[in-house]
């Protein structure tokens, strides 16, 4: 089954949103690939960061829907970085190149971990205004592979793919989830050995998020109630780390809800971003927001500032 690859939505996405390639490092082999849709006048867009197996295409349903509603959306895939600080430095340079001062980040699995680490590393000069963390984690030790992290670069491609596929859902799943898995397997096949090895290294290198550095960032935690690669323990850890986070629970969706439950995921992203309407950190064009919604947002903001003044 290759339903997603031949779907009208995916073909429309591929034919209307150009893929850009950007180099920001001295090393010309480090190329960021990204799709940038929606109004370029928006200076605080939402940026999507994929999981180990993903490419920039895996968020095509979010790119199409959100840009259609007036949001600026960037979906990207990483160059080969072997170290978290190296990744954070490269991502900061990319934001500088795109002339983006602050951004909202949606990260899936590894993408969510990298989003948190980037927010943490840049906390003294903040670049992240908010986070949506989908099926994500805060400590790489949950994978029990920190001891192998330094040997991924030696492994052949087929072994690395086997490691990743081991986390995909097994057993019966509904047709949409089956299509999502097929599409992700196809995306996994498109990654070369160094791309996969470097992502697995970042995913398993001994590291954890320091929450006190990013405590002022608005967070939504999005997870699924059915089978995913994340243990219940890892989910509970995220809730503890971000006690004030909004929670977006999906009954089903597996590892890739942004593909197989895109309508629900898009709605939760909208709800998350709505709190910034009418501010300089809005990810949406002001003309696309109804006057009524802006008024509600202004009232909400003024109430918040009043309650802060009282406290």
Swiss-Prot record:
Transmembrane segments: none annotated. It comes from the Eukaryota. Residues 86-159 form the AB hydrolase-1 domain. InterPro entries: AB_hydrolase_1, AB_hydrolase_fold, Maspardin. One of its GO terms (cellular component) is trans-Golgi network transport vesicle. Keywords: Cytoplasm. It is found in: Cytoplasm. One of its GO terms (molecular function) is CD4 receptor binding. Belongs to the AB hydrolase superfamily. This is Maspardin. It comes from Danio rerio.
């Amino acid at each position: 089954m290759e339903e997603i690859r031949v779907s009208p939505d995916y073909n429309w996405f591929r034919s209307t949103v150009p893929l850009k390639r950007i180099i920001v490092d001295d090393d010309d082999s480090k190329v960021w690939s990204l799709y940038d849709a929606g109004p370029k006048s928006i200076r605080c867009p939402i940026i999507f960061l994929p999981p180990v197996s993903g490419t920039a295409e895996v968020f095509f349903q979010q790119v199409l829907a959100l840009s259609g509603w007036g949001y600026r959306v960037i979906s990207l895939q990483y160059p080969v970085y072997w170290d978290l600080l190296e990744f954070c430095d490269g991502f900061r340079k990319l934001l500088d190149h795109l002339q983006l001062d602050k951004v909202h980040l949606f990260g899936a699995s590894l993408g969510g971990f990298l989003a948190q680490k980037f927010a943490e590393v840049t906390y003294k000069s903040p670049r992240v205004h908010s986070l949506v963390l989908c099926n994500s984690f805060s400590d790489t030790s949950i994978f029990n592979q920190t001891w192998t992290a330094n040997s991924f670069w030696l492994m052949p491609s087929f072994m690395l793919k086997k490691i990743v596929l081991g986390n995909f859902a097994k057993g019966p799943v509904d047709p949409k989830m089956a299509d999502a898995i097929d599409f992700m397997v196809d995306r996994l096949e498109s990654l070369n050995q160094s791309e996969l090895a470097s992502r697995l290294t970042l995913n398993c290198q001994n590291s954890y998020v320091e929450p006190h550095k990013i405590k002022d960032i608005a967070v939504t935690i999005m997870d699924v109630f059915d089978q995913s690669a994340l243990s219940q323990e890892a989910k509970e850890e995220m809730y503890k780390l971000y006690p004030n986070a909004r929670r977006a629970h999906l009954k089903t969706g597996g590892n890739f809800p942004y593909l197989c439950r895109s309508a629900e995921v898009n709605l939760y992203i909208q709800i998350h971003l709505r709190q910034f309407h009418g501010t300089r950190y809005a990810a949406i064009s002001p003309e696309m927001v109804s006057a009524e919604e802006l008024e509600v947002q202004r009232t909400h903001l003024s109430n918040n500032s009043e309650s802060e003044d009282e406290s």
